[in-house]
Amino acid sequence: MAIINMSDLDLQGKRVLIREDLNVPVSNGVVTSDARLRASLPTIELALANGAAVMVMSHLGRPTEGEYNPEYSMQPVVDYLAKALSCPVRLATDYLDGVDVVVGEVVVFENVRFNVGEGKNNEALSKKMAALCDVYVMDAFGTAHRAQASTHGVGMFAPIACAGPLLAQELDALGKALDNPARPMVAIVGGSKVSTKLTVLESLSGIVDQLVVGGGIANTFIAAAGYNVGKSLYEADLIDEAKRLVANAKSRGADIPVPTDVVVAGEFSPIAAATLKSVSEVADGEMIFDIGPDSAEALAKIIASAGTIVWNGPVGVFEFDQFGEGTKRIAQAIADSKAFSIAGGGDTLAAVDKYGIADKVSYISTGGGAFLEFLEGKELPAVAMLEKRGV
């Protein structure tokens, strides 16, 4: 089934309910990081321009389900949208039994997690949401991996369910990177633990030409190669798993390179003194916090020759500048590359911002967990729903 796109529909005079990911940080009633709000604006503006009466819903934070908590109210988001959009924007607190909305106006529903049954995809709640609209638009890629009432159930019962432009862009970009990638394909997977990204590593090791591992994940692979990792964060029980992934990659002509030099320190601290060492010289009392310049340069060459780059996770503790050079060099190599590049995950996006390469990455994914599950090859419930409701 082909997913229906919002941009293909006649929305004139229609009641359009858009599920966005407006889960943004708020401090003292003010939005402190507006990236997700900015990303949602084109979809809302397109619906308005096409003559729709627009309703928008999202979660914000992790309130206790079914309990109103002013700390997690959507009011700061409403205040932001009222300034960003050239139309009336208001908050609806009691909306499940009906809401008045007219063409040219935006009504933002109060936090969907204040509704009992949201998390468990309750059918009665889903039907109430669906009854509010003529067209349901799923535009929140960041929550597409969750089967909840506002992301999945409502779409099963709405008269029409379609993908918004932001979700469609995400799926197109990820499909381009994974389904038919330009070769060579390089994936960079960082993070603290192999265990949390084992499925991603397994999935990617079967399709990429080079799988670059970083952070605590790399330490487990360094240990698997027979080197001492001292007091570094690593998972001894997954050394055999790391060896298996390396062997599997080699069997299909791919590679999981291990750093040849590393940056170490005796403690995890923003003022810890960084020492450069060969990977074979790490002492028992030391911890690996970054890759060294030789390793970074070798990886930069791999990236320079790539046709497709998928980046999920830094290669060092880049929050501390003395352990950030490896991630900085990789970020620069991606920025300089002519390959199709996609970056996703919270730490990755923080690195993209820190090193100022946002406009040099082909596509920046707004989804954290959803991005990972897509990389794992898992079916995303919201996408499966849109396919089922497609044409």
Swiss-Prot record:
<comment type="similarity">
    <text>Belongs to the phosphoglycerate kinase family.</text>
</comment>
<dbReference type="InterPro" id="IPR036043">
    <property type="entry name" value="Phosphoglycerate_kinase_sf"/>
</dbReference>
<dbReference type="GO" id="GO:0006096">
    <property type="term" value="P:glycolytic process"/>
</dbReference>
<keyword id="KW-0324">Glycolysis</keyword>
<feature type="binding site">
    <location>
        <begin position="59"/>
        <end position="62"/>
    </location>
    <ligand>
        <name>substrate</name>
    </ligand>
</feature>
<dbReference type="InterPro" id="IPR001576">
    <property type="entry name" value="Phosphoglycerate_kinase"/>
</dbReference>
<keyword id="KW-0067">ATP-binding</keyword>
<keyword id="KW-0808">Transferase</keyword>
<keyword id="KW-0547">Nucleotide-binding</keyword>
<feature type="binding site">
    <location>
        <position position="36"/>
    </location>
    <ligand>
        <name>substrate</name>
    </ligand>
</feature>
<keyword id="KW-0418">Kinase</keyword>
<comment type="pathway">
    <text>Carbohydrate degradation; glycolysis; pyruvate from D-glyceraldehyde 3-phosphate: step 2/5.</text>
</comment>
<keyword id="KW-0963">Cytoplasm</keyword>
<feature type="binding site">
    <location>
        <position position="113"/>
    </location>
    <ligand>
        <name>substrate</name>
    </ligand>
</feature>
<comment type="subunit">
    <text>Monomer.</text>
</comment>
<dbReference type="GO" id="GO:0005524">
    <property type="term" value="F:ATP binding"/>
</dbReference>
<dbReference type="GO" id="GO:0006094">
    <property type="term" value="P:gluconeogenesis"/>
</dbReference>
<feature type="binding site">
    <location>
        <position position="197"/>
    </location>
    <ligand>
        <name>ATP</name>
    </ligand>
</feature>
<dbReference type="GO" id="GO:0043531">
    <property type="term" value="F:ADP binding"/>
</dbReference>
<dbReference type="GO" id="GO:0005829">
    <property type="term" value="C:cytosol"/>
</dbReference>
<dbReference type="GO" id="GO:0004618">
    <property type="term" value="F:phosphoglycerate kinase activity"/>
</dbReference>
<feature type="binding site">
    <location>
        <position position="319"/>
    </location>
    <ligand>
        <name>ATP</name>
    </ligand>
</feature>
<dbReference type="InterPro" id="IPR015824">
    <property type="entry name" value="Phosphoglycerate_kinase_N"/>
</dbReference>
<feature type="binding site">
    <location>
        <begin position="21"/>
        <end position="23"/>
    </location>
    <ligand>
        <name>substrate</name>
    </ligand>
</feature>
<protein>
    <recommendedName>
        <fullName>Phosphoglycerate kinase</fullName>
        <ecNumber>2.7.2.3</ecNumber>
    </recommendedName>
</protein>
<feature type="binding site">
    <location>
        <position position="146"/>
    </location>
    <ligand>
        <name>substrate</name>
    </ligand>
</feature>
<dbReference type="Pfam" id="PF00162">
    <property type="entry name" value="PGK"/>
</dbReference>
<dbReference type="InterPro" id="IPR015911">
    <property type="entry name" value="Phosphoglycerate_kinase_CS"/>
</dbReference>
<feature type="binding site">
    <location>
        <begin position="345"/>
        <end position="348"/>
    </location>
    <ligand>
        <name>ATP</name>
    </ligand>
</feature>
